[in-house]
Amino acid sequence: AVPDVAFNAYG
């Protein structure tokens, strides 16, 4: 998965 810091460390 791509890093999605807006939700959590991994999205």
From Swiss-Prot:
Which keywords belong to this entry?
Antibiotic, Antimicrobial, Defensin, Fungicide, Secreted
What domain of life does the native source organism fall in?
Eukaryota
Gene Ontology cellular component list:
extracellular region
Localization annotation: Secreted
Q: What biological processes does GO assign it?
A: defense response to fungus; defense response to Gram-negative bacterium; defense response to Gram-positive bacterium; killing of cells of another organism
The role this protein plays is:
Significantly inhibits the growth of Gram-negative and Gram-positive bacteria and fungi in vitro. Has antibacterial activity against S.aureus (MIC=9.6 mg/L), B.subtilis (MIC=76.8 mg/L), M.tetragenus (MIC=38.4 mg/L), E.coli (MIC=76.8 mg/L), V.parahaemolyticus (MIC=19.2 mg/L), and V.anguillarum (MIC=2.1 mg/L).
UniProt lists the family membership as follows: Belongs to the big defensin family.
This chain belongs to which protein, by name? Big defensin
- Recorded source organism is Ruditapes philippinarum
Its lineage reads: Eukaryota, Metazoa, Spiralia, Lophotrochozoa, Mollusca
